[in-house]
Amino acid sequence: MDLFEYQARDLFAKHDVPVLAGEVIDTPEAAREITERLGGKSVVKAQVKVGGRGKAGGVKLAASADEAVARATDILGMDIKGHTVHKVMIAETAPEIVEEYYVSFLLDRANRTFLSIASVEGGVEIEEVAATRPEAVAKTPIDAIDGVTPEKAREIVEAAKFPAEVADKVADILVKLWDTFIKEDALLVEVNPLAKVVSGDVIALDGKVSLDDNAEFRHPDFEALHDKAAANPLEAAAKEKNLNYVKLDGEVGIIGNGAGLVMSTLDVVAYAGEAHGNVKPANFLDIGGGASAQVMANGLEIILGDPDVRSVFVNVFGGITACDEVANGIVQALKLLEDRGEKVEKPLVVRLDGNNAELGRKILTDANHPLVQRVDTMDGAADKAAELAHAAAK
């Protein structure tokens, strides 16, 4: 889960990383009181999870409370690289900046360790610095057990050649950033720029944090960090039902058991779709191993609620998940929707194989629902689902 800048700033403050004061708002007029509290001037910063805000006009200085309101009015609702601005942060203006640095901690998946990246050339994309001046970027592996001690922080500072007058302050901030990284179960903690100001202080002016969704059970407060305004409503509904669902841009709804089978199903449907108007998969939905009839019903309800879906392909290989449970789930889901008075018009193609496949097929045959078609091979079912989706578009 990627955080907004204001959320990253709050986490930094929680772990005693020096930051500037600021508050997030979603209405322009609220900028007035905050700016007055900050001394009559502020920086209005768009809160979007994408870089390049400044170049896009999403970061503006305000020399008065009235100007802050005007800036907030301009920025709220702005589109920045496909992201709509729903909130802005009204932040304290930074003292005169003398130098800008870059520091981060991240999970190095390739080497199965943690990594520190630091540079005295901050304020720009670190990828640009690495490409043009690789010697200016210091990469230091971090032992998962030892972590970042004051001694390790000094090693990072020396490797990146930070000026002597800020070495101790940067080292102290590195220890606190590591504390943030570990205690918040982060995958990335980045400060860019980490600025030396005219007073000699070193302050985190902008930050990026990505948290590990798999660790959310350890952090009840993470729930409040989710961006509900930008969330796809189908993905949000699936999350509430503990379903592994990702919305895609096609027309064939996909349900399968096991991530590998679902990924294969996406490929087979995409291939079949080439012969049927280039229809594509509309989603990834894994109901998992041992899924009950209720889980199947929940998944089907999500997919049938997607207006882009024209047909549904249910592809199940019974192992822990018994095919009769899946079949019962399909029958239950259709009955549930119809009992609510909802119009179910999208055809379902069902392929069942493996554990209790014959019983599952019999349940579907006995139910005799006009929208459900049984196809007993994966390729044949994919072709039929693509054909039906294409026909529905005509």
Curated annotation (Swiss-Prot):
Binding site for ATP: 45, 52-54, 92, 95, 100
Broad EC category: ligase
GO cellular component entries: cytosol; succinate-CoA ligase complex
Details of cofactor binding: Binds 1 Mg(2+) ion per subunit.
Classification via NCBIfam families: PRK00696.1 (NF001913), sucCoAbeta (TIGR01016)
Listed InterPro entries: ATP-grasp, ATP-grasp_succ-CoA_synth-type, ATP_grasp_subdomain_1, Succ-CoA_synthase_bsu_CS, SUCC_ACL_C, Succ_CoA_ligase-like_bsu, Succinyl-CoA_synth-like
Signal peptide (from-to): none
GO biological process, one term: succinyl-CoA metabolic process
Keyword annotations: ATP-binding, Ligase, Magnesium, Metal-binding, Nucleotide-binding, Tricarboxylic acid cycle
PANTHER family xref list: SUCCINATE--COA LIGASE [GDP-FORMING] SUBUNIT BETA, MITOCHONDRIAL, SUCCINYL-COA SYNTHETASE BETA CHAIN
Gene: sucC1
Residues of the ATP-grasp domain: 9-237
Protein name: Succinate--CoA ligase [ADP-forming] subunit beta 1
Matches recorded under HAMAP family: Succ_CoA_beta
Function: Succinyl-CoA synthetase functions in the citric acid cycle (TCA), coupling the hydrolysis of succinyl-CoA to the synthesis of either ATP or GTP and thus represents the only step of substrate-level phosphorylation in the TCA. The beta subunit provides nucleotide specificity of the enzyme and binds the substrate succinate, while the binding sites for coenzyme A and phosphate are found in the alpha subunit.
Quaternary context: Heterotetramer of two alpha and two beta subunits.
Family that this chain belongs to: Belongs to the succinate/malate CoA ligase beta subunit family.
Binding site for substrate: 257, 319-321
Organism: Streptomyces coelicolor (strain ATCC BAA-471 / A3(2) / M145)
Gene3D superfamilies the record matches: ATP-grasp fold, A domain (3.30.1490.20), ATP-grasp fold, B domain (3.30.470.20), Succinyl-CoA synthetase domains (3.40.50.261)
Cofactor(s) essential for the protein: Mg(2+)
